Regions:
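Hydrophobic cores of alpha-helical transmembrane segments in multi-pass integral membrane proteins
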Residues: 1-10, 24-49, 59-88, 97-156
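Hydrophobic alpha-helical bundle architecture
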Residues: 93-95
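Membrane-interface segments at loop-to-transmembrane junctions
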Residues: 18-20, 55-62
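Juxtamembrane membrane-water interface segments that cap and precede transmembrane helices
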Residues: 13-23
Length: 156
């Protein structure tokens, strides 16, 4: 009963946002971000472990394992967003700040895939420190772009 006054203020979604691709695109990207957040927490935990190499190895293995589905989901999410953009606006990519930062985030998280050829990633502590810092790209993509840069992803 208390919310009936607010219901009249809710406006319908813009037609471009009524695509079924929207929910799949957003859900896929959010699942990737959740896995990246889990890697952030694993990284913080790994840096707190003192003198227990067995635990550190297990945490590192879990973080590296989670990297694959996280990057895969982000890639699929970006691809679905590009398809949706083509259907809605007639082009796949417009270098919108959100698109650009999503691509930057993808590249940042793809770097650890080359851990055998990048010396610093051979040390678990360095790997986890990188994963903690990498989450900054997710924060910028999710929050920073909306509040600082605007673009096509600002629907307010």
């Amino acid at each position: 009963a208390m919310m009936t006054g607010n219901v009249s203020q809710i406006s319908p979604l813009m037609p471009v946002l009524q695509s079924p691709l929207l929910s799949v695109h957003v859900m896929t990207v959010m699942c990737a971000y959740a896995l990246f957040a889990l890697q952030l927490l694993l990284g913080i935990y790994a840096l707190m472990i003192k003198g227990n190499n067995y635990s550190l190895d297990k945490v590192t293995a879990l973080s590296q394992f989670l990297l694959y589905p996280a990057v895969f989901l982000l890639t699929i999410g970006i691809f679905l967003g590009a398809v949706w953009a083509n259907v809605s606006w007639g082009n796949y990519w417009s270098w919108d700040p959100k698109e650009t930062w999503a691509l930057i985030t993808l590249m940042v998280y793809a770097v650890p895939f080359h851990s055998t050829s990048i010396f610093m990633f051979r040390k678990p502590q360095c790997y986890h420190l990188y994963m903690i810092c990498a989450f900054l790209s997710v924060v910028i993509t999710y929050f920073g772009v909306n509040y600082l840069l605007g673009g096509m992803h600002s629907y307010a």
